Amino acid sequence: MSINKRILLCLLLLLLVGGVSFHLIHQSPKYIAQKKEIEKQESQLVHDKDTKLPYTFLNNVIAQSGATSSVYYKSLDTGEVFYNFSGKMPAGGLIRPYVAAALLDAVKEGNLSLDETVTVTATALRKKSPALSKIKPGSKVPVRILLEDMMLDQDETALYELVRFIGWDEINAYLLRKGYADTILGSPDLVKTEETAEDKEKSETISYTSVNDMVTLLTRLYEGTCVSKELDAYLLGLMEKQNDRQLLGALLPKKLRLAQVSTSEGRVQNAGGIIYAKEKYILVIMTDKALRKDETMKTINQISSIIFNTVNDKEVFKK
């Protein structure tokens, strides 16, 4: 056999071995699992890398907040997005719309009803309950009222009674099923009577979410794909009636339509919502470990104002 034929034969053997190896690698369980995970990540509105906001000024404002911050903006008109950091953070009151969505999903499936009633006992009443603190212990409250009190008045008694009504495990199963990868419902002090070891373990957890998951939830509500068009519109309507605008809406026009949810609990200050401006957009801002609460609130106000003015083609005032 000539040298040329031997070289050609070697090349053919190398190609054959390479092809077999390539096929075996791409059919291996590990490779298939990795590929599916990548496809899953790409199909969701999830970003696991930090990116810079397009405006240096915004980055400077965020850097001066005195807190760990996550910011996510998404235009509902153009689809443009930008964000600064993204990861799981303490949810505080931002867990409320997830609980509401889980409830409405169960209602849609026929498993629960907004017309059912819950008996609110004296031991169930909590301090931060501007609505339900006025009722007589032992009163029967319709689930619809609990939902509205939770969303409109940030009523903690309403929140925890709804968690009892729906079920802690059921809510977390719903969050997992819907792809809210960073969101989990904690259950501090849910059990006020005798605690089992499992209950005690649950009581040591807190709720978490991320700007990614909040943007996904708000996008679905806006598009009517979260639960149903009718029930999504109902929940968004409650978010529009929420009067606490001290975070996202403090520096925005008072008549501006805003469907939002916010929370200010200790060192955690979070806000997220849909802003119906010249360009409709979603903005979610989450902060943690705020050393100076007033400064952090001011930072959230500034971020919201800067973005609003930018998308409305107004001059952004820079100190």
What are these regions (language model features)?
Residues 66-88:
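Short, conserved catalytic-motif segment at the N-terminal edge
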Residues 2-61, 65, 165, 216-246, ...:
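Structured C-terminal helix/loop/strand segments within mature extracytoplasmic catalytic/sensor domains
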Residues 83-85, 142-145, 152-158, 194-202, ...:
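Flexible glycine/proline-enriched surface loops and loop-helix/loop-strand junctions
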Residues 76-78, 86-87, 105-106, 123-125, ...:
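Solvent-exposed coil/turn segments that connect beta secondary-structure elements
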Residues 115-131, 166-167, 189-193, 238:
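Acidic helix-start/capping segments at beta-turn-to-alpha-helix junctions
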Residues 79, 89-120, 283:
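Active-site SXXK
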